């Protein structure tokens, strides 16, 4: 029999989110609550940072129930899964805790009541790509989790949502929290290899749509909207259109990315290894969907649209006008080699950009930037 659509549950699945206060986890938790699922957040016992405390309180106010526990304690997890009658477990644990999921899987296997498990993937299809180290170690650990899920016969869905909608800095873990460059573009390789860029809220929304959809049972779910498939050259042009100015482009070679990855600075080198895999190897676009093991979001929900990358980049425009928190008025602040541009009048913003130009240590780049600033004033941004 052919299943033509999703089969909704009569009752909402009770969903446990592990790592629900993290970067991607917040999108998942928000969507779970938005869809009306009884949502439980697993939080590690002990003190939390003020920022995480705010996140937890916000989700509690929206109806989430906080459960304290750790996934590498089988007895603890068995008790939680039984006591709260959990139906779905979504894991978003970070790289250092990926193998802790193996203990969680033992608990899931023991209770025998979990309808769906979503492991901590939320990126590439780890069985189809081989980044250099140190990223490869992370993928090997994710593969171990996949194999354990299959061995235990646990119903699963692997979310392969590719890249977050942002500028892909090769040395930044969460680039969507940083605006695209205002001084120069770093172009990886020839800049023409494409990748898929997905808004965080879409990752949350579509993930939650899959958890009780029979068509996603024991499948890899791929986020590959053609509308959001861009090369880094195309990303640069999109951002230039947004800010009304042309920025110089400089090539970051494959060797440069590999060298940065080889430095083994965690987590920055992991990001470099993934950047190389995406923009040099083309890991997001160099394979075809296997109808037996894969499904695409576009096929599952053809009437549901992804937020466009053009719209996503609109969110970054106000960020380049935000006031910098500097010790002296009018001071330009550089963080991790990236400018934080302050708000103010057009004259103030132009002054800050010119200050940035004058502090550029590379004379050749400074010359190019100065010419661009004089040719295209900030007033073009509107």
Swiss-Prot record:
Active site: 142 (proton acceptor)
Subunit and interaction comment: Monomer.
PANTHER family in the cross-refs: LEUCANTHOCYANIDIN REDUCTASE, PINORESINOL REDUCTASE-RELATED
Keyword Thylakoid found: no
Organism: Desmodium uncinatum (Silverleaf Spanish clover)
EC numbers: 1.17.1.3
Purpose: Catalyzes the synthesis of catechin from 3,4-cis-leucocyanidin. Also synthesizes afzelechin and gallocatechin.
Family: Belongs to the NmrA-type oxidoreductase family. Isoflavone reductase subfamily.
Catalyzed chemical reaction(s): (2R,3S)-catechin + NADP(+) + H2O = (2R,3S,4S)-leucocyanidin + NADPH + H(+)
Pathway annotation from the record: Flavonoid metabolism; proanthocyanidin biosynthesis
Residues binding NADP(+): 19-25, 44, 52, 146
Name this polypeptide is given: Leucoanthocyanidin reductase
